Amino acid sequence: MPSSVSWGILLLAGLCCLVPVSLAEDPQGDAAQKTDTSHHDQDHPTFNKITPNLAEFAFSLYRQLAHQSNSTNIFFSPVSIATAFAMLSLGTKADTHSEILEGLHFNLTEIPEAQVHEGFQELLRTLNQPDSQLQLTTGNGLFLNESLKLVDKFLEDVKKLYHSDAFTVNFGDTEEAKKQINDYVEKGTQGKIVDLVKELDRDTVFALVNYIFFKGKWERPFEVKDTKEEDFHVDEVTTVKVPMMRRLGMFNIHYCEKLSSWVLLMKYLGNATAIFFLPDEGKLQHLENELTHDIITKFLENENRRSASLHLPKLSITGTYDLKRVLGQLGITKVFSNGADLSGVTEEAPLKLSKAVHKAVLTIDEKGTEAAGAMFLEAIPMSIPPEVKFNKPFVFLMIEQNTKSPLFVGKVVNPTQK
């Protein structure tokens, strides 16, 4: 192939498409370390070693997105993005390799690289365990051009460590290749993410796709009949009407002085919890700057049940991001440049990551994300409960309880914004 032709990678909802670059340097040694998964300490699962890093990556990425715009909703999956790039790092070398892992908040002087990949392997295995009450699945797919020969070790590692499926496609037929990739993601997300790939470079030779799908029911649902239209204050001058779910009951809710925010934890049936943060007026940026893995862990470990009159907007939001810009702010730049070293993926031609796009969708309603026929009764103290209205911008996270991993992070500025 002529050296003037450029190949690249595309990452959508975790999709990475690889396509060649015009120059390549000699490999500077295999940066990947051998990963030994022959044994696991059952009392200290390996995913525990990477969960703090995932959380800090999540908050760093969130702050970059918030910095780009304070007037738009935010919603993304840190687990999806980190999994895709950690998997890609298996095929990178030299600075390209170290930048990705450091950008994901892994310090290889503190945690061996073998444990990073072993942690993702265990995390994905745990997330994909069947749960009769909660639907949570992740998937990784490799789409290879018919003529491309991958390095055997890379193919073995992504299958073994990241449970990846491999498919052969003809990227010369861009429409058919797009259809195959989009069908894979649409099926994996049960129709929630469709037409993920809008455009596909004819020179693409390799696509790496990661998706995560979550569908849960509130442990204690809202009554549809209690949902009423109320005002949501987008900013000092903008107010919109939104359907507001309402319930008087016992909640794991408290006011946090450190964050200047109300903190609400709502469990899903199964092993997931949503954490909502409602900051005081003018304290949104303070909240965003103060959130850390340690704070989230303390909230998850402590129960603060009290009576409250809760008002939470019913909403459906979508987040779509070009990650090249935002990850560049986190130090991940080399993989997008002509100096990228992806010789661990294939030795046939130099590659670079041409595009990285992430898409995530969220629906919050009375039952969670699907209808549920649950009924329950609870005693309410006679004292007058506080009224907590999420009727202004707020931040939220969705946490998988077994792994304490941040499945999704978001901010609602305007519930009517699609």
From Swiss-Prot:
Residues 1-24 form the signal peptide. The keyword Zinc does not apply. Pfam families: Serpin. Plasma. InterPro entries: Serpin_CS, Serpin_dom, Serpin_fam, Serpin_sf, Serpin_sf_1, Serpin_sf_2. GO terms for biological process: acute-phase response. It is found in: Secreted. Keywords: Acute phase, Glycoprotein, Phosphoprotein, Protease inhibitor, Secreted, Serine protease inhibitor, Signal. One of its GO terms (molecular function) is serine-type endopeptidase inhibitor activity. Residues 373-392 are annotated as: RCL. One of its GO terms (cellular component) is extracellular space. Glycans are attached at residues 70, 107, 271. The record marks 382-383 as: Reactive bond. The modification Phosphoserine is found at residues 38, 383. Inhibitor of serine proteases. Its primary target is elastase, but it also has a moderate affinity for plasmin and thrombin. Inhibits trypsin, chymotrypsin and plasminogen activator. Belongs to the serpin family. Interacts with CELA2A. Interacts with ERGIC3 and LMAN1/ERGIC53. Interacts with PRSS1/Trypsin. The reactive center loop (RCL) extends out from the body of the protein and directs binding to the target protease. The protease cleaves the serpin at the reactive site within the RCL, establishing a covalent linkage between the carboxyl group of the serpin reactive site and the serine hydroxyl of the protease. The resulting inactive serpin-protease complex is highly stable. This is Alpha-1-antitrypsin.
